[in-house]
Amino acid sequence: MHGLLLAGLLALPLNVLAHPTESHSSGISRRAIDITSYRLPQISKYTKSDAVPKQDDESFTTSSTGDDNVSSGDYVTTATDWLKKTLPKATYRLVNDHYIGDSGIGHVHFRQTAHGIDIDNTDFNVNIGRDGKVFSFGNSFYDGEIPKANPMVKRDFSDPVNALQGAIQTLNLPVTAKPENVKAKPVEGKENFKFEGTSGAFSDPKAQLVYLQKDGGLVLSWKVETDIGDNWLLTYVDANKNDKVHSVVDYVSAAEYKVYPWGINDPTEGNRTSIHLPWFKTLSTDWHIDGKGWYSTTRGNNAIAQENPTGGPEYENNYRPKSPLFIFKYPYSEAMTPPSSYRDASITQLFYTTNVYHDVLYILGFNEKAGNFQVNNWNKGGVGGDFAILNSQDGSGVNNANFATPPDGQPGRMRMYTWNASTPERDGCFEAGIVIHEYTHGVSNRLTGGPANSRCLAALESGGMGEGWSDFFATAIRLKAGDTRATDYTMGEWASNRPNGIRKYRYSTNLTTNPHMYVDADGLTSVHAIGTIWASMLYELLWNLIDKHGKGNVTKVRPVLKNGVPTDGRHLAMKLVLDGMALQPCLPNFVQARDAILDADKVLTQGSNKCEIWKAFAKRGLGVGAVFNPSKRTGSNELPAGC
């Protein structure tokens, strides 16, 4: 599920696998249901920084130190006033996930309401600059006529239990909810319930009464949440006709340690080695403490890693290696079989790779306030209680991986599978690119639209960019010292036993090797195919910035920043892409995400990399004249004046 999306599956189309994917029957795709036909519509608008109307001087200036006290005249008030001015007739609520990022930009998010009920797929995000003025903003608010009748007066909607049953029956979910056994228990919020007495789901299903913006109007719906493992769904069931589903969002989008070290993508690139105290000393804690105690196993503040051979929802009591001396060194070779014989090494590798990535992202700005994955946020903002649950050798499938991203405060869940396209089969935990790809789904879902909103990559092109970001970060991290812009990279080559990887083309700056252009997205319905186009553009961006700023010492794990700006082109590209995610609107398209990256550079470097960024996108058809249309995109190789 992508961000409440089940993001992932290295997300492979089945036709690229040497063997068909196998799994237990809980997955929607395995129950003959195509949830992609229920995607949310892509309706967001993004007003980039140089298109924002001129503003009068504001009294509040955001602090570059990250001081985000909410008081009269602060950045939240500025954002609220801007919304009132822009859409004076709109009713809305402030989403409680605003924060000031490490670049000094304040991010504030609003949800539209009607009769006190959320219009669930309407969002207004305002980005406040260091000068206290509106820097940019995104908008998907409904501008049509609001229904005159208040449904709360006549209670003109179905019982939530009926909606749950409608979702189960329509989507053929492996959940049992007999009317005589199920009780809808009210929880905090208007018409908000948790269901007790069901079976088959990983946690108690939930339902909330909302409006949904669809086909130019509003439909009253029950938003039914069901976590069934391979999918974690928000199903929008018509509040009067419970056999009608309007839309579906899937949150699941794919000490001393002896491991393949950071930068070694898989066993073909290097050897395992013993690494002592790998965490960054200046971050909050080491990897085995969460403020409540020390864990002499693969558990800590950022992640909890274990085997999960049954593929079930339990993880707390699952097997994980233990070492009172915190020495996690276990045997592994590619010749070992079955995978259970090296489970300790697999779990340790997964725990190591994920924690290093957490720390790298933290330095680049994905921290507590931005919605990262930590049990204890150490009073630094955001919502805690949400480490990443990491399942090694998960028994729910093969030849894939996925990551479920609920909103901030709920743990993310990564499922890593074994791959049977080789003999002996291979464990995806030993291919860092797969782990990084999956974890990045959690990052992009938390940053886009704010940490409290995990459905902002649920549209087709948005979801495609989610896959592209995941491929981009996995590729950027594996660069070697001798690489140049002539170096090409694959995805999933080792695990899948496919020399050309699992994407249509290698990532390359050579248009013969990888000819992808923006307009290639026309007619595509696979998020992975669309994602390859987006990642191809970002690979161009990566090398343009490396050619200008160098790639730095790729053997060093920790990014080097000066005045908040990475000193090398590789980490600068990663930083700009991350900052762009936080600026862009909910459900963005390629054009809006490009503009957000340009705006991120304007904030971070005063736009000193403007031309490098434009040249990267224009090379592949996303230049100045590019226009988004879901069925007929307009490509452009045009550069702005001065480039």
UniProtKB/Swiss-Prot annotation:
Zn(2+) binds at H437, H441. Residues 1-18 form the signal peptide. Glycans are attached at N271, N420, N510, N553. Pfam families: FTP (PF07504), Peptidase_M36 (PF02128). Residues 47-57 have a biased composition (Basic and acidic residues). InterPro entries: FTP_domain, Fungal_virulence_M36, Peptidase_M36, Peptidase_M4/M1_CTD_sf. Residues 47-71 are annotated as: Disordered. Its main location: secreted. Its cofactor is Zn(2+). Residues 19-254 form a propeptide. GO terms for biological process: proteolysis. The active site is at E438. Its EC number is 3.4.24.-. Binds 1 zinc ion per subunit. GO terms for molecular function: metalloendopeptidase activity; zinc ion binding. GO terms for cellular component: extracellular region. It comes from the Eukaryota. It is found in: Secreted. Residues 60-71 have a biased composition (Polar residues). Secreted metalloproteinase probably acting as a virulence factor. Belongs to the peptidase M36 family. This is Extracellular metalloproteinase 4. It comes from Arthroderma benhamiae (Trichophyton mentagrophytes).
